[in-house]
Structure formats: C-alpha cells, structure tokens
Amino acid sequence: MNAQAMDPQQYEQQLEQKCQALTEAFAHYNPPALEVFPSAPAHYRMRCEFRVWHDGDDLYYCMFDNVAKEKVRTDQFLPASELINRMMPALLDELRPNRALRHKLFQVDFLSTLSGEILVSLLYHRQLDDQWLTEARALKARLGEHFKVDIIGRARKQKFVLDRDFVVESLDVDGKTLHYKQVENSFTQPNAGVAVKMLEWALDATKQSSGDLLELYCGNGNFSIALAPNFGKVLATELAKPSVEAAQYNIQVNKVSNLDIVRMSAEEFTEAMKGEKRFNRLGDIDLQSYQCNTIFVDPPRAGLDDETVKLVQGYENILYISCNPDTLNDNLKVLSETHEVVRFALFDQFPYTHHTEAGVMLKRR
C-alpha cells in the first residue's frame, strides 16, 4: 500500500500514465487504438485484508505502507467497498470488549459484493474453542441486524464457518444479471465494477464468433458463463477444486446448458489434446467433438508456459486477458508470428498501483 498515492483527484493522471506505458510497450505489435476502461476512483475493492494491532484495550486495523516502510492505522480504507467501510468500525466495536473474540486475533479479511453480502474471516494465532464458537455465533446475530453477513474463524488446522464460506455476487452484464458464487480464499476479481467492463468487452470482442470456445484457467466460471451465449459449446479447465465446485454452482444458478468444466491444469489439458495422455477427470467429455475456433486465456502472473503458447497458437481466435503485461508481451512475441492484434484494452483493476490489467484479441493472419 502507498497511502500517499490514494488521491481521487490524481486518479486521471495516474491512469493516463498507465495508458501511455502500455501503449509504448506494445507499439511494435501495431495494435489498434487502446480501449481504456477506468475504475471508480474510490470504494472499488470488493475484498481486503487487514492486520489487527493490539494496543492495551484498543484494537485497530493496520496496513503496511511500502513507501514509508511503516504500519499505518487504517480506520477506513478508501479503495474498499462502502460495505466493507461500514463493517470495519462495526466489527471492531464488537471485538474490543470481547476477550474470547479478540485474544490473539491477528488479521481480518473481508469479502463483499455489489449484491450486499459480506463475509468476514477472523484469523488467530491460537486454537479456537467452544467459548469462541459461542461468542462468534452471538457476534453474527448482532451484526446480522444490520448486515447480510457470514463469519469464518481460522486458526492452525482449524476452520469454523458461520454459516457459509462464500458470498453470491450479482453482476449486470450487457443487460443480463449473472450470479457468481465466490468462495473465501479463492481467486475472484477484486474490482467488481471493472470486472463487469471486462466481461462486456470480452462479449463484444467475440460476438461474431463461430464454433465453440475453449477457456483455460476459468476460475469460478466468471468469463465462461458470460461468454457462453456467443458460442455453440464451451469447454473450460480449472485446477483448483474450490473454484471448480463454485463454477458448477454458477453454471446451474445461471441456467447455462452449453458449458462443461473439467478439473485439469493447462499443462494437463495440452497433453490430453495431443492425445499423449488420457485423464479420467474428463469423464464422458469427447475432446474431438468440440470445434473450438476461439480460445480464451486469463493466466496467472507468470503467463503461459511454452507448451501452452504452442497450443493456443493453433486456434483461429485468441482472447487473452493478462494481469501482467510483461509476460503478455513475452507470449505475444511468439503468438504474433501467426496472429495479429485486432483489439487492445486496458482495464484499471488496481488504481493507485503500478499494476495494469490488459486484454488483447488476436486473429490468425
């Protein structure tokens, strides 16, 4: 965190600097004009985590300032959603006088939604007992008078859930409301407003598509579910078990009938597509029955490995969302040998930081 950088009056200037840097970094690919999708300048983060500082009878949140190299008391947090900012003092007011709940509490995580749900995770440097559970239930009841809240208690090899370890987000995407189960400790897009813009951009970029879609790294089905109407069938892969389970829930709740998700890594899927190895996890799915003209990838910061780049290169259309423009640039050195960039976008998921989310649509030359 850089506390001095979080000034809404400076937001446009910071965004312009990101746009200029991204445009210059990718100029040699001769992309079309950069499409820019800004964030709200405040209250855009749906999830946050704070350390908890004990000072006598007082108890407060703190974060580490990377520039000043010191902890900063954080009673309110500008980037956090308004719901998180309302919950922050309400929770502390309950915790301060309650020894069972505050004893050796060292961190609080918040996961909120635009739909009004919030999940609070309390992390401890001690084992949790029946007294903690009793007090936590009472805490949930009191907070529940003002919030739609669930609580999780975590300690080493312990996890108590009151009553759910997930929230259900509702996003209005291109005139349609999509519902997403988001599980604690699983990846979700932190900036819901920009996440909607990313989904709408991806929908627009693929609206003239034919055939089927393959997605690697699908998470909870965030993109697959939104993009499904643009394709005959969608096949998606994800390795993390909680994300796969959430994706299956999301498929059902959104009534998507043309999407299958398999629990495999991108590397394993590459082996399966080449026929090098048969995976029982594929079940009855016949890979050869898919006519995937388009592939969608949203890889981790490390980007695509060499074998996956070769796999991706075999598709006519490539939609690539990147949380690390440096590794996107590396991957494009190979992909640009066979494909050209026809859409180029910046999504400002993380205002007031150097992080930039980029999107490119490539078509075979």
UniProtKB/Swiss-Prot annotation:
GO CC annotation terms, alphabetical: cytosol
Domain of life: Bacteria
Residue positions binding S-adenosyl-L-methionine: 189, 217, 222, 238, 298
Gene Ontology process terms (BP): tRNA methylation
Active site: 323, 357
Name assigned to this protein: tRNA/tmRNA (uracil-C(5))-methyltransferase
Assigned protein family: Belongs to the class I-like SAM-binding methyltransferase superfamily. RNA M5U methyltransferase family. TrmA subfamily.
Keywords assigned by UniProt, alphabetized: Methyltransferase, S-adenosyl-L-methionine, Transferase, tRNA processing
Catalytic activity entry: uridine(54) in tRNA + S-adenosyl-L-methionine = 5-methyluridine(54) in tRNA + S-adenosyl-L-homocysteine + H(+); uridine(341) in tmRNA + S-adenosyl-L-methionine = 5-methyluridine(341) in tmRNA + S-adenosyl-L-homocysteine + H(+)
Source taxonomy: Bacteria, Pseudomonadati, Pseudomonadota, Gammaproteobacteria, Alteromonadales
Broad EC category: transferase
SUPFAM superfamilies in the record: S-adenosyl-L-methionine-dependent methyltransferases
Enzyme Commission number, as recorded: 2.1.1.-, 2.1.1.35
GO molecular function: rRNA binding; tRNA (uracil(54)-C5)-methyltransferase activity, S-adenosyl methionine-dependent; tRNA binding
InterPro entries: MeTrfase_TrmA_AS, MeTrfase_TrmA_CS, SAM-dependent_MTases_sf, TrmA_MeTrfase, U5_MeTrfase_fam
Family annotation (Gene3D superfamilies): 2.40.50.1070, Vaccinia Virus protein VP39
Role: Dual-specificity methyltransferase that catalyzes the formation of 5-methyluridine at position 54 (m5U54) in all tRNAs, and that of position 341 (m5U341) in tmRNA (transfer-mRNA).
